[in-house]
């Protein structure tokens, strides 16, 4: 009632069923659209734990192992190079071979070297000056050597799609 949030949906699950489900408030205040129990929400980074659980379920089912090279499922990750430098004046990029392949575990732990463009100056430079799309950029460090917040979870989602033959939303 104090308008702190526009709307919400609550659900209580008990004994395999829904004991309670209810919509409150507005899905869109500006248009006056009421919240419904089937309103679709943008959940942003909450997809990370959901995708990670999907990967762990596939591991439990024996469909993959955490130390599998990610390139076994996504060939585009094979032989990823590590960024050494980006010359913003000439748009030239210097890379070197990675010490080892990126694994599923690296993608789960954000230790793959794959960065978001907004999370590192190097990744921004690769996009802005060298014109390299994020999905094709060299990695920022050797896999497993350090933590870098990045789009590894997106690659995990693509791995789920590859193994399951379904889109992640399914």
Residue locations for each model-derived region?
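Beta-lactamase-like hydrolase cores
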Residues: 1-15
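Short, conserved beta-strand segments within well-ordered enzyme catalytic domains
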Residues: 9-13, 23, 42, 65
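Residue-level signal for well-ordered, solvent-exposed loop/turn and beta-edge residues enriched
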Residues: 17-18, 63
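Amphipathic coiled-coil signal-relay and dimerization helices
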Residues: 18-25
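Active-site-proximal loop and beta-strand segments within enzyme catalytic domains
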Residues: 28-148
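Bacterial peptidoglycan biogenesis and beta-lactam-recognition machinery
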Residues: 57-64, 160-169
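Active-site-proximal alpha-helical segments within enzyme catalytic domains
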Residues: 103-110, 152-162
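Short, contiguous, pocket-lining structural segments
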Residues: 144-152, 164, 168
């Amino acid at each position: 009632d104090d308008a702190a949030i526009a709307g919400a949906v609550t659900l209580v699950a008990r004994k395999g069923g829904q004991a309670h489900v209810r919509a409150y408030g507005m899905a869109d205040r500006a248009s006056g659209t009421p919240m419904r129990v089937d309103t679709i929400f943008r959940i942003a980074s909450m997809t990370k734990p959901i995708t990670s659980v999907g990967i762990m379920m596939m591991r439990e089912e024996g469909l993959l192992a955490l130390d599998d090279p990610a390139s076994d499922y996504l060939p585009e990750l094979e032989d990823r190079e590590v960024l050494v430098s980006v010359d913003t004046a000439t748009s030239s990029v210097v890379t070197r071979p990675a010490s080892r392949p990126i694994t599923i575990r690296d993608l789960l732990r954000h230790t793959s070297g794959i960065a978001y463009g907004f999370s590192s100056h190097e990744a921004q430079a690769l996009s802005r000056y060298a014109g390299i799309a994020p999905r094709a950029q060299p990695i920022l460090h050797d896999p497993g050597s350090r933590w870098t917040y990045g789009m590894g979870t997106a690659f995990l989602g693509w791995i789920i799609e590859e193994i399951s033959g379904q889109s992640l939303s399914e």
